[in-house]
Amino acid sequence: MTDRRRINGPAGATIPPVYEDSGISEVKALKIRSRPSNIIRKIYLKTGVTPSASGSAYLELETSANSGVSGLKLSCTVHGPRSLPRSSPFSPHMVVSTHVKYAPFATKQRRGYLRDPTERDLGIHLEAALRGAIIADRWPKSGVDIIISIIEGDQDREASKTQGDEVWDMMNTLSGCITVASAALADAGIDCVDTVAGGVAALVQDSDGSPEIVVDPIPSEHRKILAACCVAYLPMRDEVTNLWFRGDLPASDMDLYTELVEKGIQASRSANRVLVDCLTETVG
């Protein structure tokens, strides 16, 4: 008789470790950014991929020309608006619930089935970004669930874990989550003040040693990332709904902060054009 119980693999399974040596350093030195500093990667965005959900969308970023660097792949489903349980307290606004989860195979190290602190942080930032766009007072005592599955993370699978690129990969992941969630909300017919899109800008230091601000950074294409910010932006209202900084910047140079945010807004505008074209094609 066949055993139908589900047998999971070991929780700590990983790919074989890759250690830093002269060969890896030479390969890493060849990974040079081919895009201009103000151009984001190409985005593929499609709505209506999950018929059973109220709204859904799929987003995929262009895969880097460098070997071993995967492109971000996200799937988002929206369930609602629907009535809250009778036991829940009255809410004059719609209750927004976000859930971000990596697939077990999405990153170099296998992810567990329970959400870790990284995924909870992404969910909190995503909820803050979407609350500024949704017109929540039109659905009193109702709720909507926004679920994002990260099918493939945006990282260099040939790099060692000690290089610390995972911190900066979260920025690009959050940016993609904001954009794909906005498309899924529009597909679900939930009223928003504007389409919100995410963008990332980073202060990087390459081999020549001079810092430079680039949009949509890939950590493997730069020697070092000093700081980065992820911006959720409403282009028609010229408003920022969420701003996330990471890294070290001199407190005395406020112009550098301003320039970094402006570059993040520029990346958000580029992503928003793809979002609007996708929704226009769907309606047409």
From Swiss-Prot:
MF annotations from Gene Ontology: RNA binding
Pfam families (alphabetical): RNase_PH
InterPro entries hit by this protein: ExoRNase_PH_dom1, ExoRNase_PH_dom2_sf, PNPase/RNase_PH_dom_sf, Ribosomal_Su5_D2-typ_SF, RNase_PH
GO cellular component terms, semicolon-separated: cytoplasmic exosome (RNase complex); nuclear exosome (RNase complex); nucleolus
Major subcellular site: cytoplasm
Coiled coil: none
Keyword Nucleus in annotation: yes
GO biological process: nuclear mRNA surveillance; poly(A)-dependent snoRNA 3'-end processing; rRNA catabolic process; rRNA processing; U4 snRNA 3'-end processing
Keyword rRNA processing: yes
Cross-referenced CDD domains: RNase_PH_MTR3 (cd11371)
Subcellular location as annotated: Cytoplasm; Nucleus, Nucleolus
Biological role: Non-catalytic component of the RNA exosome complex which has 3'->5' exoribonuclease activity and participates in a multitude of cellular RNA processing and degradation events.
Quaternary structure and partners: Component of the RNA exosome complex.
Family: Belongs to the RNase PH family.
Protein name per the record: Exosome complex component MTR3
